[in-house]
């Protein structure tokens, strides 16, 4: 609290008795006591501050002891001059922790106030001017930008160059043998290893952690290499299978091509212009598109007209009933093979005919005479054996 002292001057009244000069108050019967020296005030002038009386020489600043004549400031029972009061109880500098007089120019950084000479970098001691970049630390210290970046760089380098622990060959052998026994040893085992090797307990623990991480990483890399080799082999095998399909020649046997060369020729069993003679003629090979599962060769000729069916024996497996409609009423020539179906089974070709025409025929292909080619797509059709010899014996050759 600031209190301005009131200075009361009491002059002697002329013509008064001499005893009255001892009293500064006309109506006060007693002599006042000085608050500074605890003596009676017999001076001509009396000072009054804090509701107490003072000698003019006793009212002084508590810090600088300068006599106070016009104005003073007090805090508690002490009296101060203006400068000392603001130094002690006013705003303090964040750097030197001293009070700042209200008449002095200051600098501010956020909520902190500094003297002009205290507003400087703590590293290079350079006083910061208006416009300079600086960093305000947590303890209200100031660091210029150049020194701050340099300190950060040194700290990063010191962190990167942490001290390394050197393990001798004997210590490494002991740790390896313990790892082979148990990759994750208990605490008492680590303590025993620490005493045997002379290494710190923390060093032993970190060594086991790094060892387990290394083993896990090696296993993961090995698995990745195995899968990579597997996929490379698969890609290589696919490429070689495509080249093998392109290099297959017409006379070569495969899983999809079966040649019945050992069976008797059907041309020897029928007339020259019959169906069996036309089956022995060469025909263009029908194959699957490029990129399919395999190529299929048909060693049978096309059927040119319905006259050939009349020469077949009634009861023959190839017998087809005559068409009820006249040839003139039939639509235009229809393709005998309207669609090609390539199932994943051993069937190479499944043609289908138009309604009212000849029943669809099935070309069989297999791995040998004993193969069974009955599939779901052949439901409704009689399943013939793979070899024609097994059912040709039932045909009466005398009628041909």
From Swiss-Prot:
Annotated GO MF terms: DNA-binding transcription activator activity, RNA polymerase II-specific; RNA polymerase II-specific DNA-binding transcription factor binding; transcription cis-regulatory region binding; transcription coactivator binding; transcription coregulator binding; zinc ion binding
Keywords on record: Activator, DNA-binding, Homeobox, LIM domain, Metal-binding, Nucleus, Phosphoprotein, Repeat, Transcription, Transcription regulation, Zinc
Taxonomic superkingdom: Eukaryota
UniProt-annotated location(s): Nucleus
Keyword flag DNA repair: no
DNA-binding region: 160-219
PTM annotation (Phosphotyrosine): residues: 230
List of residues that carry Phosphoserine: 74, 237, 241
InterPro entries: HD, Homeobox_CS, Homeodomain-like_sf, Lhx3/4-like_LIM2, Lhx3_LIM1, LIM_Homeobox_TF, Znf_LIM
Record-linked CDD domains: homeodomain, LIM1_Lhx3b, LIM2_Lhx3_Lhx4
SUPFAM superfamilies: Glucocorticoid receptor-like (DNA-binding domain), Homeodomain-like
Tissue: Mostly expressed in the pituitary anterior and intermediate lobes. It is also expressed in the pineal gland and transiently in the primordia of motor neurons including the spinal cord, pons and medulla oblongata.
Signal peptide: none
Region described as Disordered: spans on this chain: 215-280, 297-400
A Pfam family the protein falls into: LIM
GO cellular component annotations of the record: chromatin; nucleoplasm; nucleus; transcription regulator complex
PROSITE patterns xref list: HOMEOBOX_1, HOMEOBOX_2, LIM_DOMAIN_1, LIM_DOMAIN_2
Compositionally biased intervals (Pro residues): 319-334, 352-361
Gene Ontology BP annotations: apoptotic process; dorsal/ventral pattern formation; inner ear development; lung development; medial motor column neuron differentiation; motor neuron axon guidance; negative regulation of apoptotic process; pituitary gland development
Bias kind Polar residues: ranges: 368-380
Domain LIM zinc-binding: 34-84, 93-147
Oligomer and partners: Interacts with POU1F1. At neuronal promoters, interacts with LDB1, in motor neurons LDB1 is displaced by ISL1 and a ternary complex is formed in which ISL1 contacts both LHX3 and LDB1; allosteric structural changes in the DNA binding domain of LHX3, induced by the ISL1-LHX3 interaction, may explain differences in sequence specificity of the different complexes. Interacts with LDB2. May interact with CITED2/MRG1.
PANTHER family tied to this protein: LIM/HOMEOBOX PROTEIN LHX, LIM_HOMEOBOX PROTEIN LHX3
Protein purpose: Transcription factor. Recognizes and binds to the consensus sequence motif 5'-AATTAATTA-3' in the regulatory elements of target genes, such as glycoprotein hormones alpha chain CGA and visual system homeobox CHX10, positively modulating transcription; transcription can be co-activated by LDB2. Synergistically enhances transcription from the prolactin promoter in cooperation with POU1F1/Pit-1. Required for the establishment of the specialized cells of the pituitary gland and the nervous system. Involved in the development of interneurons and motor neurons in cooperation with LDB1 and ISL1.
Description of its domains: The LIM domain specifically interacts with the POU1F1/Pit-1 POU domain and is required for synergistic interactions with POU1F1, but not for basal transcriptional activation events.
Name of the protein this chain belongs to: LIM/homeobox protein Lhx3
Gene expressing this chain: Lhx3
């Amino acid at each position: 609290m600031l209190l301005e002292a009131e200075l009361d001057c009491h002059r002697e009244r002329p013509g008064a008795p001499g005893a009255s000069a001892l009293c500064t108050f006309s109506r006060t019967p007693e002599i006042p006591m000085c608050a500074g020296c605890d003596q009676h005030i017999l001076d001509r002038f009396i000072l009054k501050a804090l509701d107490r009386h003072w000698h003019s020489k006793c009212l002084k600043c508590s810090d600088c002891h300068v006599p106070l004549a016009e104005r003073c400031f007090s805090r508690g029972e002490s009296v101060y001059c203006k400068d000392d009061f603001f130094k002690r109880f006013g705003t303090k500098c964040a750097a030197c922790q001293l009070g700042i007089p209200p008449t002095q120019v200051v600098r501010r950084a956020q909520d902190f106030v500094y003297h002009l000479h205290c507003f400087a970098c703590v590293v290079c001691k350079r006083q910061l001017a208006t416009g300079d970049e600086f960093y305000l630390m947590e303890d209200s210290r100031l660091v210029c930008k150049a020194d701050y970046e340099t300190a950060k760089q040194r700290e990063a380098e010191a962190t990167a160059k942490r001290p390394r622990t050197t393990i001798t060959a004997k210590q490494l052998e002991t740790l390896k043998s313990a790892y082979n026994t148990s990759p994750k040893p208990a605490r008492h085992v680590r303590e025993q290893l620490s005493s045997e090797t002379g290494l710190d307990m923390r060093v032993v623990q970190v060594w086991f952690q790094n060892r387990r991480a290394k083993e896990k990483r090696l296993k993961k890399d090995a698995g990745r290499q195995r899968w990579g080799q597997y996929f490379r082999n698969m890609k290589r095998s696919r490429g070689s299978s495509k080249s093998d399909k392109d290099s297959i020649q017409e006379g070569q046997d495969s899983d999809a091509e079966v040649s019945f060369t050992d069976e008797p020729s059907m041309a020897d069993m029928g007339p020259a212009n019959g169906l069996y003679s036309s089956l022995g003629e060469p025909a263009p090979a029908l194959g699957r598109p490029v990129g399919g599962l395999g190529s299929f060769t048909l060693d049978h000729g096309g059927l040119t007209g319905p006259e050939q069916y009349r020469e077949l024996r009634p009861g023959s497996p190839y017998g087809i009933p005559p068409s009820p409609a006249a040839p003139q009423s039939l639509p235009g020539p229809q393709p005998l093979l309207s669609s090609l179906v390539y199932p994943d089974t051993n069937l190479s070709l499944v043609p289908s005919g138009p309604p009212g025409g000849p029943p669809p025929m099935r070309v069989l292909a297999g791995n040998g005479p004993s193969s069974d080619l009955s599939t779901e797509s052949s439901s409704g059709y009689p399943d013939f054996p793979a070899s024609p010899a097994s059912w040709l014996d039932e045909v009466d050759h005398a009628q041909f």
